[in-house]
């Protein structure tokens, strides 16, 4: 296992940087187009849009069947494609700080999963992980993303990435799993042992957002009161959809066991990078080693010291110190295979 130190990540970055990070944290950004936003909401949205632009991303939408996808896209379509998948109660904007390192040399696609962000689904939508993976596949096809593609998933997004790679092995060039969800023998947090406890992380009333930050991040950033209230309000509005996702995770845990989950993961042979925050309170760090044992072609896990469940927000520079060389290695190996007579 590789261990890295964040070297005083709390060396308080400038207020603007902290604010940008804060606005990304677990952002759930559904706002009805017919709903009038107040000044704080508009400022909040403007900050997120500026962050996307700073990362080289543009906001787009695409209707595929009964899902109207909201997604960010950046980089040249002639470059290798990366698909980044957000976690529970997250959104595409969770990846912005990572994406700015990627859009120069890669074609980056970051959708809002159904149930998060601005993606629109019917009231009776099936939020099960298998259906999310299938809908994501339909999105990839409709967006004309030429495979195989690199796939990265954080938390719940990791579970979806694993299922996607298992179902579509020839369309998966590599996997990057960040504090990935799943069903594990080494589960040692209340949220893994009994997913019903995930309901405690729902932001359904005032004060819940502060609790969520403390549970998911080792060193939560400062958030100005006005922006905290705006973020909390948006997440409260999103709570019914998040609740449906949690209900599906509870149901999944009753159907699948660590053994059946292992059967899936053992079929995956895509090159895999596993990265974890050592202080993750949601999915304990021991899971990283279990995933390494299950996956055929995984590198030794990278463990980040003084980081919680959100490395892509808490320590994006350390994340990219690992991910960029991994991507280059995969691309180089593939090129050598295609040029070998």
PLM feature segments, named:
Residues 261, 270, 284-292:
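Short alpha-helix in the alpha/beta-hydrolase fold that links the catalytic acid
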Residues 188-192, 203-266:
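Conserved alpha/beta-hydrolase catalytic His-Asp/Glu region
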Residues 65, 72, 110-152:
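Active-site loop/oxyanion-hole signature of alpha/beta-hydrolase fold enzymes
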């Amino acid at each position: 296992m590789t261990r890295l130190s964040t070297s005083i990540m709390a060396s308080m970055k400038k207020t603007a940087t902290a604010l940008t990070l804060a606005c990304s944290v677990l952002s759930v950004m559904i706002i009805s187009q017919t709903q009038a936003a107040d000044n704080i909401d508009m400022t909040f949205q403007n900050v997120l849009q500026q962050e996307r632009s700073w990362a080289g991303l543009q906001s787009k939408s695409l209707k595929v069947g009964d899902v109207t996808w909201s997604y960010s896209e950046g980089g040249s379509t002639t470059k290798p494609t990366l698909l980044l998948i957000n976690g529970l109660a997250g959104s595409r904007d969770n990846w912005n700080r990572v994406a700015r390192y990627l859009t120069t040399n890669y074609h980056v696609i970051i959708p809002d999963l159904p149930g998060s962000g601005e993606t629109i689904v019917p009231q009776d939508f099936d939020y099960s992980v298998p259906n999310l993976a299938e809908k994501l596949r339909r999105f990839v096809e409709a967006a004309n993303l030429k495979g195989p593609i690199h796939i990265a998933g954080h938390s719940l997004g990791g579970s979806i990435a694993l299922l996607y790679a298992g179902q579509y092995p020839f369309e998966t060039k590599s996997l990057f799993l960040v504090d990935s969800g799943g069903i594990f023998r080494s589960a040692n947090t209340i949220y893994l042992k009994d997913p019903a406890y995930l309901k405690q992380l729902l932001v359904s009333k005032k004060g819940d957002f502060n609790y969520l930050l403390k549970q998911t991040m080792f060193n939560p950033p400062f958030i100005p009161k006005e922006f905290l209230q705006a973020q909390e309000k948006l997440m409260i509005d999103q709570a019914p959809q998040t609740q449906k996702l949690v209900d599906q995770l509870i149901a999944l845990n009753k159907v699948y066991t660590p053994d059946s989950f292992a059967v899936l993961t053992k079929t995956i042979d895509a090159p895999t990078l596993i990265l974890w925050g050592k202080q993750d309170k949601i999915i304990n760090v021991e899971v990283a080693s279990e995933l390494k044992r299950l996956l055929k072609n995984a590198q030794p896990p990278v463990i980040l010291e003084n980081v919680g469940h959100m490395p892509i927000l808490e320590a994006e520079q350390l994340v990219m110190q690992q991910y960029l060389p991994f991507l280059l290695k995969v691309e180089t190996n593939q090129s050598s295979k295609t040029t070998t007579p």
